[in-house]
Amino acid sequence: MYIPTISPYAFKIGPIDVHWYGIFMAISIAIGGYYLYRQAMKLNYDEDFLLNLLMIVVISGVVGARLMFVLANYPEWFIKDPVQVLKIYEGGLSWHGAVLGGFLAGLYYCRKKGVRINPLEDFAVLGLSIGNILVRIGNIFNQEVLGRPTEFAFGRWPAQLVGVAMGIILLIRYFYIQKKHMPDGYQFWSFIFYYQLMRGLIEETVRDNPLIWPVYLNEKWGIGFFTLTQLVTPFILILAYWMIRRVLNDPNKQFYN
């Protein structure tokens, strides 16, 4: 949805403009991190280990989000204007890069400390779901992640609200799965599977992103295939499904050692 009168700035601190997007992201990180910490403490994880892990995952997630965004959209910056890559305050983050960066850093740290990551990655799902909700709301303030124009009465697909709905569905699903006591690791990989399925089939179809492989475009309906995210969706689904099967077939195994 596009609201031209809305401001992306919540307030100013001296010369610094504080974006609503940043506030929503910080809130989601705080909620997700606190929840993971509290749940992990119930399983007797070491407190210092958890605090260090959270710091490493958050920093690596932000770095991964920025690098993936630049790689997918402006790869020439790495050579022609590397300083631009560092200007994260100007916007431009990738959800997939954030998850990949945070996961790999968390995996490395857990392996270094000899700690099982499977339960921890499951606890991260709540924060990821809430993050999808709040960050998409932040996208509305930033006037980004817009939907494709359409000839339907609403004029443009509300892609950000589609993302909010996805986050709500995944959050409800998280609590439902928690009650079923599935094996460690199932929550995380099934979350990745269903997130990517909805992202590739629904959100990206109505989102105003470039079609890397323009197989189909209906300007009247405002839908199109295939964006970059849609092209990588089958590979992510295969990986997630493979990990789900491994978790279900051998619940007690730590698959990342």
From Swiss-Prot:
Single GO MF annotation: phosphatidylglycerol-prolipoprotein diacylglyceryl transferase activity
Residues that, per the record, bind a 1,2-diacyl-sn-glycero-3-phospho-(1'-sn-glycerol): R136
Transmembrane segments: 13-33, 49-69, 88-108, 123-143, 152-172, 185-202, 223-243
Enzyme Commission numbers on file: 2.5.1.145
GO BP term, example: lipoprotein biosynthetic process
Enzyme class: transferase
Keyword presence, Plastid: no
Membrane topology qualifier: Multi-pass membrane protein
Metabolic or biological pathway, per its Swiss-Prot or TrEMBL entry: Protein modification; lipoprotein biosynthesis (diacylglyceryl transfer)
Compartment annotation: Cell membrane
One CC-aspect GO term: plasma membrane
InterPro entries (UniProt xref): Lgt
Keyword annotations: Cell membrane, Membrane, Transferase, Transmembrane, Transmembrane helix
Family statement: Belongs to the Lgt family.
Job description of the protein: Catalyzes the transfer of the diacylglyceryl group from phosphatidylglycerol to the sulfhydryl group of the N-terminal cysteine of a prolipoprotein, the first step in the formation of mature lipoproteins.
Protein name: Phosphatidylglycerol--prolipoprotein diacylglyceryl transferase
UniProt source species: Thermoanaerobacter pseudethanolicus (strain ATCC 33223 / 39E) (Clostridium thermohydrosulfuricum)
